[in-house]
Amino acid sequence: QGAGAAAAAAGGAGQGGYGGLGGQGAGQGGYGGLGGQGAGQGAGAAAAAAAGGAGQGGYGGLGSQGAGRGGQGAGAAAAAAGGAGQGGYGGLGSQGAGRGGLGGQGAGAAAAAAAGGAGQGGYGGLGNQGAGRGGQGAAAAAAGGAGQGGYGGLGSQGAGRGGLGGQGAGAAAAAAGGAGQGGYGGLGGQGAGQGGYGGLGSQGAGRGGLGGQGAGAAAAAAAGGAGQGGLGGQGAGQGAGASAAAAGGAGQGGYGGLGSQGAGRGGEGAGAAAAAAGGAGQGGYGGLGGQGAGQGGYGGLGSQGAGRGGLGGQGAGAAAAGGAGQGGLGGQGAGQGAGAAAAAAGGAGQGGYGGLGSQGAGRGGLGGQGAGAVAAAAAGGAGQGGYGGLGSQGAGRGGQGAGAAAAAAGGAGQRGYGGLGNQGAGRGGLGGQGAGAAAAAAAGGAGQGGYGGLGNQGAGRGGQGAAAAAGGAGQGGYGGLGSQGAGRGGQGAGAAAAAAVGAGQEGIRGQGAGQGGYGGLGSQGSGRGGLGGQGAGAAAAAAGGAGQGGLGGQGAGQGAGAAAAAAGGVRQGGYGGLGSQGAGRGGQGAGAAAAAAGGAGQGGYGGLGGQGVGRGGLGGQGAGAAAAGGAGQGGYGGVGSGASAASAAASRLSSPQASSRVSSAVSNLVASGPTNSAALSSTISNVVSQIGASNPGLSGCDVLIQALLEVVSALIQILGSSSIGQVNYGSAGQATQIVGQSVYQALG
């Protein structure tokens, strides 16, 4: 063993000696501290007394070829102010069954008294082919210092363990502005060993090494500190997040480890906990799940088999005044995304996104459960609710999105969106259940109701929107899309506003105007359409209010009319729902019930009938005006089935009377020429009068349809019996003028 340079004076620098080369058997060598092939150790530099001294540790010896142990390299012990040093390198392991040398065990830079010191941990030794282990890096403990953890050793090729990464803190900086990075783990073995080096695991069934466990930057006292967490292991390593507790500090959570290829579990990433004013942070990402049955991580992506997805960054994005943050990504299986909780004045935040459902039968993740923006103390805060998770493909349930609860004066918020339903038989997600804008203390607040979730192909239902603010303006929720089978469409609830003089949509009381909610679209099969806005179109307690009822659903929905109880108000009843495509009945529109003096109202419109044999909707059932001197109009009846009228007219064409009328029309048109508008007008008039005389029960519309069909039949007969010469395609406009003039003369 060669002795190193012992520099004891101020500013001295020394390098450890190299050990000698030993014999080929078991002797110990020297020469600059390189150990023998047996078990030699290299001595490090002991620059112990002077300020500003720098030194490097010795290199460990080469291990023996038989069963010897590799040497250890001693680190630099720099105990003075501002000193910097690097740990020693571990020795090479033996080729047989011996252990690989440990890395520099000494401190990288133990500059305990002064600021600004920097140091790096030692590198672990190369493992042997049997079971060698890598070294550990030591931390830097000085004020304001920056340090990096040591690198783990390379694992063995057989069943040995890979080296552990730098276990010490990357930079335990207690002063202002300190920054540091955690250590990297060692590379794992190719067989079943445990991994290290950034947490890369083994290729077989071994467990991945742990990543940098120390905090990226624990800048606990001052502002502006930044740090990043360590990388997790491949198997089950965890990445430690940045714990930035100082004012204005920014930090990012650690990344979880990559899951194993067998059955390992993915790591979970811790979020950034920024508790001071104005701080911003992002939650950590979970680890990637295993390909077999392991649990996932990394942004919450789940396993490909049946494992559960890892949880996303659960910590709050930012809990400070005016701070903004985003929740973590939920897991693919059942992970939840935590929303941003901004509890200070005027803060803005967005809720987390729900997790993706599993591919088997797992449940879809819940949307951001935290409040989008809980701006409880100040005015003008804005926030958006979380988005619901995607449902599973099997039988899982879609997620729910929590709305924004803005309780401050004049606050504005939007409700969350409901989750997508699954493809099997699960239920579609409910829309944002929270209030659109619960601005209970001040006037003028605005908010929008939530959108109902898309129904599944089974029986999903849409959500409802509620708006309860004083003087606020809010819109009711939109009903969900109905299912394709027999499910029911969602209901859209109107806005129930209890204050006066508010202006907006959906049932604002007072002098304002409101509109009812929209009903859901009905199903394509035989399901029932959603009900229209059930809330009052305009429940006005004052004079002059105006409102419109909600639109009914596609199947058999009903539109609730405007229930106006005020004096002098003008209201219109609701519109009936669109009939179903099969045999559904059109909706009924409730009329306007105006109970005050001098009020004027119009009845509701009936629904459109079905395309098949459905009935047309009934007109406005309510009273047009129940007051003295009032003027009102009755409701309009529904439009009947157009298809049934046309089919009936076509069936009458085969009667002998119709054939006689067509023959007479052919004779008149041929004798008068093709461009004689007077002859065409006379022919149409004669056919209409003859049909009406022979069919006294037909309506005027039915007679007109029958006459036009017979005139078209006559024209086809003329074309089929003629020799058609050159056709002037450019004079089609002249023909349309002739037909229009003839119809006007015959029926006008």
Curated annotation (Swiss-Prot):
<feature type="repeat" description="17">
    <location>
        <begin position="425"/>
        <end position="458"/>
    </location>
</feature>
<comment type="similarity">
    <text>Belongs to the silk fibroin family.</text>
</comment>
<feature type="repeat" description="23">
    <location>
        <begin position="583"/>
        <end position="612"/>
    </location>
</feature>
<feature type="repeat" description="1">
    <location>
        <begin position="1"/>
        <end position="25"/>
    </location>
</feature>
<feature type="repeat" description="21">
    <location>
        <begin position="526"/>
        <end position="555"/>
    </location>
</feature>
<feature type="repeat" description="4">
    <location>
        <begin position="67"/>
        <end position="96"/>
    </location>
</feature>
<comment type="function">
    <text>Spiders' major ampullate silk possesses unique characteristics of strength and elasticity. Fibroin consists of pseudocrystalline regions of antiparallel beta-sheet interspersed with elastic amorphous segments.</text>
</comment>
<feature type="repeat" description="8">
    <location>
        <begin position="192"/>
        <end position="204"/>
    </location>
</feature>
<dbReference type="InterPro" id="IPR038542">
    <property type="entry name" value="Spidroin_C_sf"/>
</dbReference>
<feature type="repeat" description="15">
    <location>
        <begin position="361"/>
        <end position="394"/>
    </location>
</feature>
<feature type="repeat" description="3">
    <location>
        <begin position="39"/>
        <end position="66"/>
    </location>
</feature>
<feature type="repeat" description="24">
    <location>
        <begin position="613"/>
        <end position="642"/>
    </location>
</feature>
<feature type="repeat" description="11">
    <location>
        <begin position="263"/>
        <end position="292"/>
    </location>
</feature>
<dbReference type="InterPro" id="IPR021001">
    <property type="entry name" value="Spidroin_C"/>
</dbReference>
<feature type="repeat" description="22">
    <location>
        <begin position="556"/>
        <end position="582"/>
    </location>
</feature>
<feature type="repeat" description="12">
    <location>
        <begin position="293"/>
        <end position="305"/>
    </location>
</feature>
<protein>
    <recommendedName>
        <fullName>Spidroin-1</fullName>
    </recommendedName>
</protein>
<feature type="repeat" description="10">
    <location>
        <begin position="236"/>
        <end position="262"/>
    </location>
</feature>
<dbReference type="Pfam" id="PF11260">
    <property type="entry name" value="Spidroin_MaSp"/>
</dbReference>
<feature type="repeat" description="16">
    <location>
        <begin position="395"/>
        <end position="424"/>
    </location>
</feature>
<feature type="repeat" description="18">
    <location>
        <begin position="459"/>
        <end position="485"/>
    </location>
</feature>
<dbReference type="GO" id="GO:0005576">
    <property type="term" value="C:extracellular region"/>
</dbReference>
<feature type="repeat" description="6">
    <location>
        <begin position="131"/>
        <end position="158"/>
    </location>
</feature>
<feature type="repeat" description="20">
    <location>
        <begin position="513"/>
        <end position="525"/>
    </location>
</feature>
<feature type="region of interest" description="25 X approximate tandem repeats">
    <location>
        <begin position="1"/>
        <end position="655"/>
    </location>
</feature>
<feature type="repeat" description="7">
    <location>
        <begin position="159"/>
        <end position="191"/>
    </location>
</feature>
<feature type="repeat" description="2">
    <location>
        <begin position="26"/>
        <end position="38"/>
    </location>
</feature>
<comment type="subunit">
    <text>Major subunit, with spidroin 2, of the dragline silk.</text>
</comment>
<keyword id="KW-0677">Repeat</keyword>
<feature type="repeat" description="5">
    <location>
        <begin position="97"/>
        <end position="130"/>
    </location>
</feature>
<feature type="repeat" description="14">
    <location>
        <begin position="334"/>
        <end position="360"/>
    </location>
</feature>
<keyword id="KW-0964">Secreted</keyword>
<feature type="repeat" description="25">
    <location>
        <begin position="643"/>
        <end position="655"/>
    </location>
</feature>
<keyword id="KW-0737">Silk protein</keyword>
<feature type="repeat" description="9">
    <location>
        <begin position="205"/>
        <end position="235"/>
    </location>
</feature>
<feature type="repeat" description="19">
    <location>
        <begin position="486"/>
        <end position="512"/>
    </location>
</feature>
<feature type="repeat" description="13">
    <location>
        <begin position="306"/>
        <end position="333"/>
    </location>
</feature>
